[in-house]
Each structure stands twice: as C-alpha cells, then as structure tokens.
C-alpha cells in the first residue's frame, strides 16, 4: 500500500496555492464540517479497534498461506496475485486521478474518504482473514509539514513509519502558512527517504525475525489451548476443551510444518533482499568513498599548493628587502671609493697605480734597450755587407786585371818570339836542318821556357807584366773613391 501511495504521490502543481479563501469562522460554524469531522473521528476509532484486535490475535488459518512481513520497497514482488492481501491492497490503493482530486475538493470531500475506509473495513470483516493486512493509523504531528491525519494500509503486522506521500485529510482549522511548511517538508522528506531506508530495513528485518521466533515458540506451546480457524472465520471454543486424538495431532504437525516452511521461505527472501541491499549499499559506499578520497586528495593538493605559493611569496618579499639593503650598502661603498679616488687618498688604488707605473717604466726601459740592440745589430750587418762588397770589388778588379795582363803578356811574348825568330840565325837555318836537329832544338827551347816560367811563378805579376806609364794623382784618387777606400771629404 505504501509503495502504491509513494509511486502515485500528489504533485505540488495540482495542490491549490491558496485553498483557504473562505474565512475560518464560516468553516467552523458550518454543520457540514462538523459532521465530516465526526465521521472522520469515528472511522479513525474503528480502524484503531481493528488494529488492536489484529495485534491481539496473531493466529493464521491452517488452510491459508502465511505471508511474511514485507518491506515497503519490495511489496509488488513478494505479494501473491490470488492472496487476500493483494485484493485488499488493490481495493484500498488510490489512483493518481483520485489523489489529485482530493486536495482540490473542499472539506466536504472528507465524507468520501471516510466511506472508502468503511468499505475497506467491511470487506475485511466479510473475508474474515487474520493477519492478512494490518491497518495502521498514524498521525504525523511531529513536523509542521504533516498536515492532517494519514491512514496507511500495510501488509506487515508491525506498522512501518516512512516519509512517503500519504492520503491527507485537511482539517479546517489550519492556516495558509501550513501549506508552505508542507511544501518544504515534502522536499525534506524525499531527501531523507534514501538515508533512512537502509537503517529501517535492518531494524525491520531483525525485529521480524525476533517476532517470528517468538510467535513460533508460542504457537508450538499454546497450540492445544488456542482456537483453530477454518475458512477464514472464527469458531467458538468447544465444551470438551481442546481436541484430542490422531487427527488433531496431524493437523498440528501440518500447521507446524507449514509454519516452518513459510518462515524458512520468508527468511530466505529476507536474506536475499538484505544481501542485494547490502551489495548495492557497499557499491554506493565504495563509489562515494572513492569520490570523496579523490576530492580530499584534490583538496589537499590545492591546500599544499596554496601554502607553497604563500611561502614562496614570503620568501621573495624577504629576498627583495635584503637585496635592496645590500644594493644600498654597495652603492654607498662605491660612492666613498669614488670620492677617495678623486681626492687621491685611496690607498689600494694608489698602490695599484704605483705598481702600474713601475711596470710601465720597466717595459719602456726594456723596449729602448731592445731597440738600441736591434739598431746596433743592423749597423754591424751593414758594416759587414759594405766590407764584403769592398773585398768582392777588389777581388773582381784583381781577377780582371790578371785576365787582362795574361792576354797582354801572351801577345807580347808572341811578338818577341817572332822578333827572335826573325833575327835569330838558327831559326833561319832550321829549314836547312834535318828533322832530328829541328826537333832537338824545339825541345831545348820548350825546356828553357818552362824553366823560366817556373822561376817566375814565385814572383807577383806572373806572367811578366808590361811596363805601364806612371798614372796621375787624380786617376789614383778616382780609383780609390770607386773602391770605397776614401770618402769625398777626405783628401
């Protein structure tokens, strides 16, 4: 029932924004409103009595199937089609059109709601089913969002309170501000459904298991003292007390076996539902944890980067202050040194200048000495060259003179030889001499000439030079000037 109501919740757009246009005094004073309030109170009292009777007699018929308590999110899968619970839910479930038409109507429409509830209760009494569907009447008065009283029809023995869209019956004593709070509360309730769903599933499953165990124990112990049910109707106790015999024992065993089988099936279904829900919860938790860890890691990285940037900025600012101070000190020192240099009072600068001047003087002195030595070497080379040229000139003159003298001497010797041959009688008589005599004479003459030449070889002027006339003083002076022995200034 809760699933149907939750799926077919009334949209906020259908609800009227200002449902109380009429004054409140007129609503309270109208007899129709009073009658509708009385009917609503009577229907609520009847439903509470039915719930109390169902809770006081938690027995199931042996011929009917036992239906396990169902979770509100899984009702449609567990309820059988032919079970009376499904019929009851189908009879009590309202469509979207009916739910949409409820708030549009005024207070007079509460009569229809109360009649529907009475019809449901009458059908339940006619079928005479026990523990098929328990009607739970709740009043959501804790929050300002729950306006009016809500009537829920559930399949479980224990009423399950959830923040779902229920059938609301508006009381005429409410104000316009309650509708605004209702809209806010519906949004809050829809957000809280997911968070409370897992905890309620666990609590309901544990509570139902405990109730099943207690009910099984009580049924096995008090089965002889309880009144059996047949065909969904209650029977009066017999005068003879509880039944005895083989038939009653068989029935007891059959009921116990059916109870255990239904309990085992319900437990299996519960375990399957719990495992599936736990797996889905674990997956969601893992995803959330992974995403949260990633977000936390990103946040930590961003925080660390921010801290690092702040630290770098502080370091840079401090470094700029220190740098400016150092540069200021350096500039002051440089200005002081400049003044000292201009005033020629800087000790280190003066010492450096003295060293530079000393080294400069040494280099100049060495350069001058080297230059003088180079000049002296050049002079010596020139003297050597000039003297060599003079000696070469003298040698060439002597060689030329000797060559000329040899030529002249040969010519003179030839002339004298011709003269001798002309005036020498032996030369004349050679023609009359025999060949032997002429050969001997020629041999003697050659030997004589050779002996003369050998004697003259030891004397200068060989061969014998001719007599030359005496040269004048000017000729001798010119010759000496050309030879370089005399200069023009010298006489």
Curated annotation (Swiss-Prot):
Component of the RPD3C(L) complex. Residues 10-20, 175-186, 216-227, 282-301 have a biased composition (Basic and acidic residues). One of its GO terms (biological process) is negative regulation of transcription by RNA polymerase II. The keyword Lyase does not apply. GO terms for molecular function: histone deacetylase binding. Coiled coil: none annotated. Keywords: Chromatin regulator, Nucleus, Phosphoprotein, Repressor, Transcription, Transcription regulation. It is found in: Nucleus. Residues 1-74, 155-301 are annotated as: Disordered. It comes from Schizosaccharomyces pombe (strain 972 / ATCC 24843) (Fission yeast). This is Transcriptional regulatory protein dep1.
């Amino acid at each position: 029932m809760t699933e149907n109501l939750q799926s077919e919740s009334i949209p906020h757009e259908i609800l009227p924004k200002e449902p109380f246009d009429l004054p409140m005094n007129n609503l309270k004073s109208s007899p129709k409103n009073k009658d509708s309030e009385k009917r609503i109170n009577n229907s609520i009292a009847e439903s509470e009595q039915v719930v109390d009777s169902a809770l006081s007699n938690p027995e199931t018929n042996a011929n009917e199937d036992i239906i396990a308590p169902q979770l509100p999110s899984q009702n449609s899968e567990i309820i059988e089609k032919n079970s009376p619970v499904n019929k009851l839910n189908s009879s009590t479930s309202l469509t979207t059109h009916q739910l949409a038409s409820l708030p549009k109507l005024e207070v007079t429409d509460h009569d229809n709601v109360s009649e529907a509830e009475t019809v449901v209760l009458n059908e339940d009494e006619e079928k005479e089913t026990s523990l098929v569907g328990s009607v739970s009447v709740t009043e959501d008065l804790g929050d300002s969002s729950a306006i009016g009283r809500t009537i829920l029809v559930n399949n479980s023995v224990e009423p399950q309170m959830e923040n779902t869209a229920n059938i609301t019956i508006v009381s005429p004593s409410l104000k316009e501000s309650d509708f605004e709070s209702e809209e806010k509360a519906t949004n809050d309730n829809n957000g809280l459904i997911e968070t409370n769903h897992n905890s309620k599933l666990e609590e309901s499953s544990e509570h139902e298991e405990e109730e099943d165990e207690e009910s099984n124990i009580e049924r096995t112990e008090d089965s002889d003292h309880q009144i059996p049910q047949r065909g969904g109707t209650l029977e009066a106790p017999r005068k003879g007390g509880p039944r005895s015999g083989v038939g009653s024992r068989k029935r007891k065993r059959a009921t116990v076996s059916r109870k255990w089988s239904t309990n085992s099936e319900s437990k299996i279904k519960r375990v399957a539902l719990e495992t599936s829900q736990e797996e889905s919860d674990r997956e969601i938790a893992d995803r959330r944890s992974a995403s949260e860890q990633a977000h936390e890691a990103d946040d930590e990285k961003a925080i660390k980067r921010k801290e690092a940037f702040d630290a770098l900025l502080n370091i840079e600012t401090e470094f700029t202050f220190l740098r400016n101070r150092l540069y200021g000190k350096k500039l002051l020192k440089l200005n002081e040194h400049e003044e000292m240099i201009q005033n020629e009072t800087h000790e280190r600068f003066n010492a450096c200048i003295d060293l530079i001047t000393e080294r400069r003087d040494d280099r100049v002195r060495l350069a001058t000495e080297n230059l003088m030595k180079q000049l002296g070497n050049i002079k010596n080379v020139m003297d050597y060259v000039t003297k060599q040229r003079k000696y070469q000139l003298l040698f060439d003159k002597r060689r030329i003179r000797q060559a000329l003298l040899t030529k002249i001497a040969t010519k003179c010797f030839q002339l004298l030889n011709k003269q001798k041959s002309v005036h020498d009688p032996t030369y004349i008589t050679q023609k009359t001499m025999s060949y032997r005599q002429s050969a001997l004479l020629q041999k003697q003459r050659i030997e004589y000439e050779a002996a003369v030449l050998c004697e003259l070889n030891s004397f200068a002027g060989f061969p014998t030079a001719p007599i030359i006339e005496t040269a004048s003083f000017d000729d001798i002076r010119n010759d000496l000037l050309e030879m370089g022995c005399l200069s023009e200034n010298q006489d």
